[in-house]
Amino acid sequence: MAKRYGKPIFPGAFTPTEILTAWEAGADIVKIFPADSVGPNYLKAIHAPLPQIKLMPVGGVNIENCGEFIKAGAAAITAASCIAPKKDIAAGNWDAITGYARQMLANVKAARNK
């Protein structure tokens, strides 16, 4: 149904079989969750025999490790709490949140340029 209306499909998967099944079913990108339990090397291992599958780690991606996930073959990353911590939202600390986002973006760009 989503494809009919031109909407992207990002199902979650974990095992290689689930990842391939999601891709063959029409996923645009397959979310790997929870990414922090397997790390960037897992994405690299999946991406080696299945380079056509776009992977997006979710869960545990942060400013420090986002570049490693990109280098391992992630097409995109998903991060929330590390960019916008509840304490900073509650305090209205928008400059800090902007800084976190800028740092993550810089780390992703640096990883893609290597």
Identify what each model region corresponds to.
Residues 1-10, 49-56:
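Short beta-strand/loop segments at the ligand-binding rim of alpha/beta enzyme cores
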Residues 2-4, 70, 86-114:
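C-terminal helical cap(s) of enzyme catalytic domains, especially alpha/beta-barrels
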Residues 5-7, 15-28, 40, 46:
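Anionic-ligand binding region
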Residues 11-16, 35-37, 56-63:
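Glycine-rich beta-to-alpha transition loops that act as phosphate-gripper elements at the mouths
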Residues 17-25, 42, 61-77:
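Catalytic cores of alpha/beta
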Residues 32-40, 72-94:
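Glycine-rich phosphate-binding active-site loops on the catalytic face of alpha/beta enzymes
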